[in-house]
């Protein structure tokens, strides 16, 4: 335990909390070609690679992912939720934060039903999360 004198000389530092989705906290001024620190809830990007990835132990699957170059010129890996997708290279996608626990390095989700990403077909429940319109009764 430090003495009062030691604390006077060098006070305690508060912990610095780092963001969970750092690419959303960076903006880009294309006119000045400089990055700014403007946060946004979602970001637009272009898919540069679409593929599958295996999760960490104890799970086993082929999880769909896309490598995305964002509008702020940062390239990130994003998860494609739902069953089936229509994404390919050069598709324009909308990204939100949110990691995938069993995929290392995946900190973002692609928003289904926005921009070039279609919603999930034949989905009856939880439709808003997967960009599916209400079925005709």
Curated annotation (Swiss-Prot):
Q: Name one Pfam family in it.
A: Ribosom_S12_S23
Q: Name one GO biological process term.
A: translation
Name positions with the PTM 3-methylthioaspartic acid.
102
Q: Where is this region: Disordered?
A: 1-57
Q: What molecular function terms (GO) are annotated for this protein?
A: rRNA binding; structural constituent of ribosome; tRNA binding
Keywords, in A-Z order: Methylation, Ribonucleoprotein, Ribosomal protein, RNA-binding, rRNA-binding, tRNA-binding
| Keyword Ribonucleoprotein tagged | yes
Q: Which Gene3D superfamilies match?
A: Nucleic acid-binding proteins (2.40.50.140)
Q: Name a single GO cellular component.
A: small ribosomal subunit
Instruction: State whether it acts alone or in a complex, and with which partners, per the record.
Output: Part of the 30S ribosomal subunit. Contacts proteins S8 and S17. May interact with IF1 in the 30S initiation complex.
Its function, per the record, reads: With S4 and S5 plays an important role in translational accuracy. Interacts with and stabilizes bases of the 16S rRNA that are involved in tRNA selection in the A site and with the mRNA backbone. Located at the interface of the 30S and 50S subunits, it traverses the body of the 30S subunit contacting proteins on the other side and probably holding the rRNA structure together. The combined cluster of proteins S8, S12 and S17 appears to hold together the shoulder and platform of the 30S subunit.
Which family is this sequence assigned to? Belongs to the universal ribosomal protein uS12 family.
Q: What is this protein called?
A: Small ribosomal subunit protein uS12
Taxonomic source organism: Streptococcus pneumoniae (strain Hungary19A-6)
Q: What lineage does UniProt assign to this protein's organism?
A: Bacteria, Bacillati, Bacillota, Bacilli, Lactobacillales
